[in-house]
Amino acid sequence: MELAVVWSVLVAQTMLALAMAFALYRMARGPRAQDRILGLDTLYINAMLMLITFGIRTANTVYFETALIIAVIGFASSIALAKFLMRGEVIE
């Protein structure tokens, strides 16, 4: 792999780790439940992107498949949490 790609991936991983720390802070300190859910959504998206950058760095497809699973589970949990906040129940 070219040196520019390696450095780009390392910079991206560093920025994603920083974004994950900020999202974790928002999730822990959010004054409302909506802020905590937003922090959780941001955290799973950043985790998914971190796995994709690991996949690029190692040229291993397992990371891409894991990122896809995280995306599907994160989307379903976001919908369930939003429905719970609006109606107070998830299953009707």
UniProtKB/Swiss-Prot annotation:
GO terms for biological process: potassium ion transport. Coiled coil: none annotated. GO terms for molecular function: sodium:proton antiporter activity. May form a hetero-oligomeric complex that consists of six subunits: PhaAB, PhaC, PhaD, PhaE, PhaF and PhaG. This is Probable K(+)/H(+) antiporter subunit F. Its main location: membrane. Keywords: Antiport, Cell membrane, Hydrogen ion transport, Ion transport, Membrane, Potassium, Potassium transport, Transmembrane, Transmembrane helix, Transport. It is found in: Cell membrane. It is a multi-pass membrane protein. Belongs to the CPA3 antiporters (TC 2.A.63) subunit F family. NCBIfam families: PRK06161.1. The chain crosses the membrane at residues 4-24, 36-56, 62-82. Pfam families: MrpF_PhaF. InterPro entries: MrpF/PhaF-like. It comes from Rhizobium meliloti (strain 1021) (Ensifer meliloti). Part of a K(+) efflux system which is required for the adaptation of R.meliloti to alkaline pH as well as for the infection process during symbiotic nodule development.
